[in-house]
Structure formats: structure tokens, C-alpha cells
């Protein structure tokens, strides 16, 4: 691999000790022509990143989500996620496993897996099309009253319910907010979407699984409630009356490096169920 990029969460490495260690290890194992250290809030020319053969992300799940949201529309470089955070459910390896991970990449003992992304636009608002690796949440504000929501699938009304909100989740996001709200766990390589009501006041409101090629439209009936759309828990936009949230599968994928010794169920047992 000739050109390698590194993105690090500076809040977790304020003195650059981890960054400097990773740079040394990358040179030792992969001997690249260039190592480009990229700010996680990068605002430069994305063309500078298109030549990367590998992007190493140092942080936790939040850092990876931010990278997916920010960079997925402009580059399709494979990502090696190294956990220097807390949970690290989405990452490829822990920082203690860095040597092994880089060696495996050196000898070609890895695979690149594609993870589904969601695309989100707000009807009636001029804004960019957003991407989400985990979920799109349409929900009331903290101090707002319960709101009513209409959910359409391919322009056909699926459900109307009162509650705190609704989560539209990818398989990757099924272990996040959706899981806490009673949604199902979904194998990450599937191309499906879950629709999960949040604290519904309607007894028959239950999570729904649909094919990823379906389009979802959420119409909050806003009266006295403040309703927001939140992308991966990192970006929030307030909705006004008559705004509708349109959600569909993005044409891009999040490409992440994985190793055969890290099965999905092993990670579930260790990090979600706390079973060694």
C-alpha cells in the first residue's frame, strides 16, 4: 500500500503519543510512500484523499461514525478502525492488536466488507443530502410533548402513532439506539432497514424490518412539539411544520477491513452482552 491516511480523535490523544506510535508501526510493516495525517474535521480538497490505499481511523465508534458521514460520498478507501476509545463495537481491532492488524494487511490476510449507509433529505428544506452509518432518528425535543408520526414505505402509509419518535436503522445501527429501543439485532452484511418506534403510545406499534431498497418517509405532525432529525447522533436539524424526512439506501458503502478471527457473534458476546 503506497499511500496511507491516518485520522485520529485528538481528544483521546492530546500529546500525539498514539499517533506517533502508529506512524512508526505503519512505516515498519507497510513501508508506504506517503503517510497523510488527516484532521477528523478536515475541510480541505477531498481530491487530495482519493489516492489513499488505506485509511486508518484511531478513535472509538463515534469517530468512525463521523468518518463515514463525512467522507463516504467522496472516497471509497478501505478503513482500518483501531479502538482507542471506550466500547469500540464498530472497529476492526484494539490498539493493543495494532501489530497483528498491520501484519495481516501486509501479507494480505484480510477482507474488505461493505456496510450499508442511509441517505437522508428533508423535504421543504434546502440542505445537503446526509449519510448515516447507524441511524436516522426523528424525535421530539427533550422538553417537548409527545408528537404524532406518520410513516410511509414507498409512499404507502405504513403506520400512524403517537410517541417520542422513530428510528430508521441500518444493520450496523441495530446494536445502537435501535437496540435500546427494543429493535432487533441484524447481521451487519445484510441490506435491510429496521423501523423502530420510540416509546410509542399505541400498543400495536412494533419494529418493522424492510428490504433496503424501499424508501421510507417520516411525517411528524408538529403542533406544540419541537421535532428534530438526528443523523448518527452527531448532527441534528429542527423540523418545521410540513417538513418530511425522506430516507433511502445510499448508493455508497462504508468499506471496512475485517479479519477472520473477529466474528460478529464473538464481538456481540464480548462487547454487547459482556460475555467473554
Swiss-Prot record:
GO terms for cellular component: cytoplasm. It is found in: Cytoplasm. Its main location: cytoplasm. Its cofactor is a divalent metal cation. NAD(+) binds at residues 61-62, 134-135, 145, 162, 164, 172, 175-180, 234. InterPro entries: ATP-NAD_kinase_N, ATP-NAD_kinase_PpnK-typ_C, NAD/diacylglycerol_kinase_sf, NADK. Its EC number is 2.7.1.23. It catalyses: NAD(+) + ATP = ADP + NADP(+) + H(+). One of its GO terms (molecular function) is NAD binding. One of its GO terms (biological process) is NAD metabolic process. The keyword Iron-sulfur does not apply. Keywords: ATP-binding, Cytoplasm, Kinase, NAD, NADP, Nucleotide-binding, Transferase. The active site is at residue 61. Involved in the regulation of the intracellular balance of NAD and NADP, and is a key enzyme in the biosynthesis of NADP. Catalyzes specifically the phosphorylation on 2'-hydroxyl of the adenosine moiety of NAD to yield NADP. Belongs to the NAD kinase family. HAMAP family: NAD_kinase. This is NAD kinase. It comes from Clostridium perfringens (strain 13 / Type A). The lineage of its organism: Bacteria, Bacillati, Bacillota, Clostridia, Eubacteriales.
Amino acid at each position: 500500500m503506497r499511500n496511507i491516511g491516518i485520522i485520529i480523535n485528538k481528544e483521546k490523544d492530546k500529546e500525539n503519543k498514539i499517533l506517533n506510535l502508529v506512524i512508526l508501526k505503519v512505516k515498519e510493516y507497510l513501508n508506504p510512500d506517503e503517510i497523510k495525517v488527516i484532521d477528523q474535521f478536515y475541510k480541505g480538497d477531498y481530491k487530495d484523499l482519493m489516492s489513499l490505499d488505506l485509511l486508518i481511523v484511531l478513535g472509538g465508534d463515534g469517530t468512525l461514525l463521523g468518518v463515514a458521514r463525512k467522507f463516504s460520498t467522496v472516497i471509497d478507501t478501505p478503513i482500518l478502525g483501531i479502538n482507542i476509545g471506550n466500547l469500540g463495537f464498530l472497529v476492526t481491532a484494539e490498539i493493543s492488536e495494532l501489530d497483528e492488524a498491520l501484519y495481516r494487511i501486509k501479507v494480505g490476510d484480510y477482507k474488505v466488507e461493505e456496510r450499508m449507509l442511509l441517505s437522508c433529505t428533508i423535504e421543504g428544506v434546502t440542505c445537503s443530502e446526509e449519510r448515516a452509518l447507524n441511524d436516522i432518528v426523528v424525535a421530539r425535543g427533550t422538553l417537548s410533548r409527545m408528537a404524532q408520526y406518520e410513516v410511509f414505505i414507498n409512499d404507502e402509509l405504513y403506520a400512524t402513532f403517537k410517541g417520542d419518535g422513530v428510528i430508521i436503522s441500518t444493520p450496523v445501527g441495530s446494536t445502537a439506539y435501535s437496540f435500546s429501543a427494543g429493535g432487533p439485532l441484524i447481521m451487519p452484511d445484510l441490506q435491510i432497514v429496521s423501523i423502530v418506534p420510540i416509546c410509542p403510545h399505541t400498543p400495536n406499534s412494533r419494529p418493522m424490518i424492510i428490504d433496503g431498497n424501499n424508501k421510507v418517509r417520516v411525517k411528524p405532525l408538529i403542533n406544540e412539539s419541537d421535532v428534530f432529525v438526528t443523523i448518527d447522533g452527531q448532527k441534528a436539524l429542527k423540523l418545521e411544520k410540513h417538513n418530511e424526512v425522506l430516507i433511502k439506501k445510499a448508493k455508497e458503502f462504508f468499506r471496512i477491513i475485517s479479519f477472520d478471527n473477529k466474528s460478529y457473534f464473538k464481538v456481540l458476546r464480548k462487547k454487547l452482552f459482556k460475555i467473554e
